[in-house]
Amino acid sequence: MDKKASGISGENALFGDVPNDVVGTTYEMGLDGIFDDGETDVIESPADAEEHVTTDIVADEGDNLITKVDDMIGYLKRECQDHGIAVRKEWVNVLTRKFHMSKKIYASHLDFFLLGVMGERHVAVEKDFKDTAVRLSDEVNKMSGISKKVADNETRMIKELDAKMKEMGSLIGKFNGVLNEFKGSMAVSSRPASVASWALDQTTETSREKNYNEFLKKLGFQDHHIKSPLMKKCTVMITDEMYDEVMLENTSEDTLGIYKEQIITYGQSIQKKVEKPIKKDPYADF
């Protein structure tokens, strides 16, 4: 069988059940409908459409329908309480006005209203949080600057205090040196002239000779200087304050140097007096 014969046979098989007396209808595009067959269709109004709603559908929609203002306010308060939100009077006024305008309101309307309120609250909280974070950052920067200034001032004050303390220590050392020199000169001038008193002083000095040796060592004198007769004469200028201060190691290196210089100066003055030339007696030969 050729292809043409096969095609005709397939077409007859496809439309074999269609009756031969079917008459086609002509449709024309009109302004009042998408497909207009010449007849006028009646379009139902919304009111007519509502009349055709069955009782079962109204019952289903009435499950969430709020018909009283008090019920609406009660529902709003319960939902707000569940979400931890305080009801505002302005919200009640807005919803009441909306209820009276539409004569009906659904619970879903209130849910969307609360979603809007919560969204606005979240945005406000986020903005406040950002503003607070910015203010805290500014305050932290200010406090950091203040802390740095305080630290710098503290360091400067410590340095100034150290300098003042060193200056005061130096002045105190000089003052002690002058005071000890004065006390030494007073001790020399007030030395007893009687033989008995002199012998008593010599006995006392001899008993403390070992301690004086230690005292002189702390000042930096060598052993041969300490044991010299001239040094023994210099011990009279050593005051109790000088002795205790040096032996207890309560003095500075500068003060030790001052004490040593005073003893050397005193020894030199004694040596000059001893070496002073004696005038020859013109009558010695007679």
UniProtKB/Swiss-Prot annotation:
Any single Gene Ontology cellular-component annotation: host cell cytoplasm
Name the UniProt key words of this record, in alphabetical order. Chaperone, Host cytoplasm, Phosphoprotein, Viral RNA replication, Virion
Keyword Phosphoprotein set for record: yes
Source taxon at top rank: Viruses
Where, per UniProt, does this protein localize?
A: Virion; Host cytoplasm
Mod. after translation: Phosphorylated by host kinases.
Principal location class? virion
Question: Would the keyword Chaperone turn up in this protein's UniProt record?
Answer: yes
Q: How does it assemble?
A: Homotrimer when phosphorylated. This trimer is stabilized by binding to the L protein. Binds soluble protein N, and ribonucleocapsid.
User: What function does this protein fulfil?
Assistant: Non catalytic polymerase cofactor and regulatory protein that plays a role in viral transcription and replication. Stabilizes the RNA polymerase L to the N-RNA template and binds the soluble protein N, preventing it from encapsidating non-genomic RNA.
Protein's name according to its UniProt entry: Phosphoprotein
The organism named in the record is Northern cereal mosaic virus
Please spell out the taxonomic lineage of the organism that makes this protein: Viruses, Riboviria, Orthornavirae, Negarnaviricota, Haploviricotina
